[in-house]
Amino acid sequence: MADQLRWDYLSCYGHPHLKTPHIDSLAKKGIQFESAFVQSPVCGPSRASYYTGRTVFSHGSTWNQVPLPIGELTIGDYLRQSGIRTGVVGKTHMRPDLEG
């Protein structure tokens, strides 16, 4: 997942100068969205929705640094069950739920 990336900064969407060959290759083999939306204008809750497949108010992470509840399954949990190694790189504005 690439986030914080403007659609009009990709050559597959017609940027006249920037070249993004790897993302263009993924777009050619997959799906290009012409209209999409996020669950929250705040990045942390929006990422939590991507991770869980749930709306902001159903998973409870309503602001940056508000953790997902312990036991909340994410895409990483499901991928690991299939033997796929996962990791997170970069800022996520997510924290572990230390209080449980």
Locations of regions flagged by a protein language model:
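Formylglycine-dependent sulfatase
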Residues: 1-100
